[in-house]
């Protein structure tokens, strides 16, 4: 049953029999902006949501792993690519879908990439080749815009922001 438990201020799912509280918390999405020379790795999604659109390799964290372990795992799963993490790069709060998106800068250990089970295509792109109109998620688009601005400026500061729900037309 959905109710406010004693000592809490928000409605929670509470078992009427044992009174156990089932907390529903935001999901963590982790991924990499993975670079080889002047190109970055993008994956064309083979699953919903946003089937057929491009994104960086990223996905939900698994229990028992760190954020950077999850980002490395997702890059391997989605693009059969091995990376070395450079630094934490961006964190985006996406409250309307209860997600927190964490991206790392990473170096590809070699340029050999190929699609994983959930990916239609994995490819390295120069900035001018990126299919900007076919990027799957606002968080990824924001991170890539910052990334290329930062590259031109010669420094990669940490970025943080909130992705608001798109307005209905």
Predicted region positions:
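Short, highly charged C-terminal tails/helix-capping segments
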Residues: 160-166
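Unchanged
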Residues: 61-146, 150, 154-156, 167-169
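Conserved hydrophobic/aromatic beta-strand scaffold that supports enzyme active sites
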Residues: 12-14, 33, 42, 103-105, ...
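Conserved Nudix-box catalytic region and its N-terminal flanking loop in Nudix hydrolases
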Residues: 35-77
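Short connector loops at helix/strand junctions that flank enzyme active sites
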Residues: 10, 25-29, 35-37, 49-51, ...
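Active-site donor-binding loop signature of nucleotide-sugar glycosyltransferases
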Residues: 17, 45, 58, 106, ...
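Acidic, metal-coordinating catalytic segment for phosphate/diphosphate chemistry
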Residues: 1-32
């Amino acid at each position: 049953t959905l109710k406010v438990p004693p000592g809490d201020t928000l409605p929670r799912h509470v078992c009427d029999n044992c009174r156990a509280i089932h907390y529903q918390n935001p999901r963590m999405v982790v991924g990499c902006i993975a670079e080889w020379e002047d190109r970055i790795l993008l994956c064309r999604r083979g699953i919903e949501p946003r089937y057929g659109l491009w994104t960086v390799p990223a996905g939900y964290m698994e229990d028992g792993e760190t954020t950077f372990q999850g980002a490395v795992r997702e890059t391997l799963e989605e693009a059969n690519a091995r990376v070395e993490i450079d630094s934490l790069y961006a964190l985006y709060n996406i409250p309307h879908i209860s997600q927190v998106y964490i991206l790392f800068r990473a170096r590809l250990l070699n340029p050999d990439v190929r699609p994983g089970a959930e990916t239609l295509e994995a490819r390295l792109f120069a900035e001018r080749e990126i299919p900007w109109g076919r990027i799957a998620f606002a968080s990824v688009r924001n991170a890539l815009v910052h990334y290329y601005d930062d590259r031109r400026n010669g420094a990669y500061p940490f970025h943080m922001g909130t992705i608001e729900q798109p307005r209905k037309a």
